[in-house]
Structures are given as structure tokens and as C-alpha cells.
């Protein structure tokens, strides 16, 4: 009798131990490496295993206290979405932000391709994981060309494997996630510190005082000098526009300093009025390393932009007041079929109309 009771007691103790281990693993399984096989112990618990292979590259850390550079997607998300990394620096920022926003809106997991990671990760603390090329090539994608403003159909995309394309850079896609977008596009410390060091050395020309208000000025030139008039019946920002924009800030802010960056710095030095001693040409204009100029602009208090996504993102991240070039194409421009000003510029930004007279001159026989 005693032996039987002792045996039953041992079996009961063993059963309690096994159940305790199962309960512990069930509660704490997120602390173990992803993919730990608990399905045998907990058959009702299905592991969410993505139908893709990913790899994380340097620069995708979630934060200074993150223990892993590979962010974990919430279990409620499914599918795999990505975006073609087309265009230059500002274009790819727009594609990244739009992918992130649309994927969240539709309950999908977002991944970026290696080329986008190579363009953005050296500059920002981005967190989206990277899709392996071999998985990209094997995935049965449906491709979707986006236009540059949010549409109702984009809120109900049911494709589990979707590859976005186009050049979206409209606040209407992602402005409801502004703080998250700003975190994604947080500069690495060394870039921020370098930009702040440059700004800290600036002095007002007439008094030698430290400026208290910095206005970043981005002047887009380069290929736009031909593309805008020849293809889009448009203009780029001229000296008259820049003078009006600077005067707008001078009237509203005490002793601002204008920090000019451009991919046409020689033109800027010859055409921007510096007689008031409040203009400095601080950018290096190197299109191969745009993040230096970009970092400078984002560390300013306010922004003057001409045209282009580079200037948009500098203004969006800097915050403060923004003045932009408005109505820079003729009314019959094909550009207006793919570009909506009300979706491109935030409502609180201030537009100054472009001078279109050079285009009317070209149009005359």
C-alpha cells in the first residue's frame, strides 16, 4: 500500500514538473530565439513563421538599447510587401515612408530591398528588415504602380505579396504616422553632430554674433535645368524667388542666418544677394554624398525649398516654417497629371509663385 502511494506521489510530482515547464515555455517563448520549436509541447500554439528569408545588415538597429538588429513583426501582420528602390536619395525616402504606411494600414509586413538599405541605412536609423535577393526572385509578386497621392483603393489592398513601384512622396500617405516617420529618419549621431558643429561655427556677418535662427535653403539645379523647361514646361527657383523667400523670414524672425545648400553652388554664389551678411554657403553640393547637405538642412529651424523630394524631406524633418516654390509649371503641363500640389505640400507651408515668363518667351514662335 505504501509503495503504491509513493509511486502515485512520484507520478503526480513528475506531472506537475512537466506542466510547469510547458507553462514556463509558453509564457516566455518570446525570450527565446525565433523559431524555437514549441509546437510539440503546445500543439495549439502556431508559430508565425514568415514565408520569406530575410537578412539584416548593419544599420538596421531598432534603437540604442536594442538587443537585436532584426526587428520582430507583430504576430497580427501577414504577407510580404516591398517597394522598388527607384531614383535618388529623396525618392527612396518617399518610397520607404509610403511602403511603411501602406503596409501598416493593410496589416502587412514590410521589407526593403538591399539597394534601398544601401542608400538609407548609412544615414538613418531605419528599422525595416531587408529581403534576401533569392527570396525576392522566387516570390510571386503582384506589382502595383502608385501615383503620388493617397487614394481610397490603397486602404484596401488584399494582395499578400505586393511590390510597390513609382515615386510616391506625398504627405497624404504617411502624415498620420509623422512621429514614427521622423524616428525612422533619425540621423546617425556622427552626422547630426557634424552638422551641428558646422552650424555652431556660423556668425552673423555684420555683428559677428551667434545666430539664433537657422533657415536651411535647398536650391535644386543640375538636371532640372533641362528637364523642367523641356519636358514639363516648368521652371526652377530663380534669384527673385529666393530673395522673396528670405525676405519672408527676415520679416518674421529676428536675425536669421540662411544656410544654402545646392547641387549648383556656383550659381548660388553668383545670384543670391549676400549684402545683408546673413547668408552662408555651407553645403558641399556633392550628389554622390547627399547626406552631408541633408543633415545640415534637417538641423536648421526652418526651410526654404525650391522643387524636388530632397527639399521636401529636409523641410518635413526640420519642422518649423517652410516656404516653397508654387505654380512652377504652365497650366497645360503634363506634370500636373502626376503631381498634385495640395498633396505635395503641407497645408501650413507657404507658397510663393514662380516667375513663368521665361516659359512664355520660349513658347513664342
UniProtKB/Swiss-Prot annotation:
The keyword Glycosyltransferase applies. The lineage of its organism: Eukaryota, Metazoa, Chordata, Craniata, Vertebrata. This is Galactoside alpha-(1,2)-fucosyltransferase 1. One of its GO terms (biological process) is glycosphingolipid biosynthetic process. It comes from Homo sapiens (Human). Induction: Increased by TNF. Changing residue 154 to C: Found in individuals with Bombay phenotype. It is a single-pass type II membrane protein. It is found in: Golgi apparatus, Golgi stack membrane. InterPro entries: Glyco_trans_11. It catalyses: a beta-D-galactosyl-(1->4)-N-acetyl-beta-D-glucosaminyl derivative + GDP-beta-L-fucose = an alpha-L-Fuc-(1->2)-beta-D-Gal-(1->4)-beta-D-GlcNAc derivative + GDP + H(+); a ganglioside GA1 + GDP-beta-L-fucose = a ganglioside Fuc-GA1 + GDP + H(+); a beta-D-Gal-(1->3)-beta-D-GlcNAc-(1->3)-beta-D-Gal-(1->4)-beta-D-Glc-(1<->1')-Cer(d18:1(4E)) + GDP-beta-L-fucose = alpha-L-fucosyl-(1->2)- beta-D-galactosyl-(1->3)-N-acetyl-beta-D-glucosaminyl-(1->3)-beta-D-galactosyl-(1->4)-beta-D-glucosyl-(1<->1')-N-acylsphing-4-enine + GDP + H(+); a neolactoside nLc4Cer(d18:1(4E)) + GDP-beta-L-fucose = a neolactoside IV(2)-alpha-Fuc-nLc4Cer(d18:1(4E)) + GDP + H(+). PANTHER family: GALACTOSIDE 2-L-FUCOSYLTRANSFERASE, GALACTOSIDE ALPHA-(1,2)-FUCOSYLTRANSFERASE 1. Belongs to the glycosyltransferase 11 family. Changing residue 242 to R: Found in individuals with Bombay phenotype. The chain crosses the membrane at residues 9-25. Pfam families: Glyco_transf_11 (PF01531).
Amino acid at each position: 500500500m505504501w509503495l503504491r502511494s509513493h509511486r502515485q506521489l512520484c507520478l503526480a510530482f513528475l506531472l506537475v514538473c512537466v506542466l510547469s515547464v510547458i507553462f514556463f515555455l509558453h509564457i516566455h517563448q518570446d525570450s527565446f530565439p525565433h523559431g524555437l520549436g514549441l509546437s510539440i509541447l503546445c500543439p495549439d500554439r502556431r508559430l508565425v513563421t514568415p514565408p520569406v528569408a530575410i537578412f539584416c545588415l548593419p544599420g538596421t538597429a531598432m534603437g540604442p538599447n536594442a538587443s537585436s538588429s532584426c526587428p520582430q513583426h507583430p504576430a497580427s501582420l501577414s504577407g510580404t510587401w516591398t517597394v522598388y528602390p527607384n531614383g535618388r536619395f529623396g525618392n527612396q525616402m518617399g518610397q520607404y515612408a509610403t511602403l511603411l504606411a501602406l503596409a501598416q494600414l493593410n496589416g502587412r509586413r514590410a521589407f526593403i530591398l538591399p539597394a534601398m538599405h544601401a542608400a538609407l541605412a548609412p544615414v538613418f536609423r531605419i528599422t525595416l528588415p531587408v529581403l534576401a535577393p533569392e527570396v525576392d526572385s522566387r516570390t510571386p509578386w503582384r506589382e502595383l504602380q502608385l501615383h503620388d497621392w493617397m487614394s481610397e483603393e490603397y486602404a484596401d489592398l488584399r494582395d499578400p505579396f505586393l511590390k510597390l513601384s513609382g515615386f510616391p512622396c506625398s504627405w497624404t500617405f504617411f502624415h498620420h504616422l509623422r512621429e514614427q516617420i521622423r524616428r525612422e529618419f533619425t540621423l546617425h549621431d556622427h552626422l547630426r553632430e557634424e552638422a551641428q558643429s558646422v552650424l555652431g561655427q556660423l556668425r552673423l556677418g555684420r555683428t559677428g554674433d551667434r545666430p539664433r535662427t537657422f533657415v536651411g535653403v535647398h536650391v535644386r539645379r543640375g538636371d532640372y535645368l533641362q528637364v523642367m523647361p523641356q519636358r514639363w514646361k516648368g521652371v526652377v527657383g530663380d534669384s527673385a524667388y529666393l530673395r522673396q523667400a528670405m525676405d519672408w523670414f527676415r520679416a518674421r524672425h529676428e536675425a536669421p542666418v540662411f544656410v544654402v545648400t545646392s547641387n549648383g553652388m556656383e550659381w548660388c554664389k553668383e545670384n543670391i544677394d549676400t549684402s545683408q551678411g546673413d547668408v552662408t554657403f555651407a553645403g558641399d553640393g556633392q550628389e554622390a554624398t547627399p547626406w552631408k547637405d541633408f543633415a545640415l538642412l534637417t538641423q536648421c529651424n526652418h526651410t526654404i525649398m525650391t522643387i524636388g523630394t530632397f527639399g521636401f524631406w529636409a523641410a518635413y524633418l526640420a519642422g518649423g516654417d517652410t516656404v516653397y516654390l508654387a505654380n512652377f509649371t504652365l497650366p497645360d503641363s503634363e506634370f500636373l497629371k502626376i503631381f498634385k500640389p495640395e498633396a505635395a505640400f503641407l497645408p501650413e507651408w507657404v507658397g510663393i509663385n514662380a516667375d513663368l515668363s521665361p516659359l512664355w518667351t520660349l513658347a513664342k514662335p
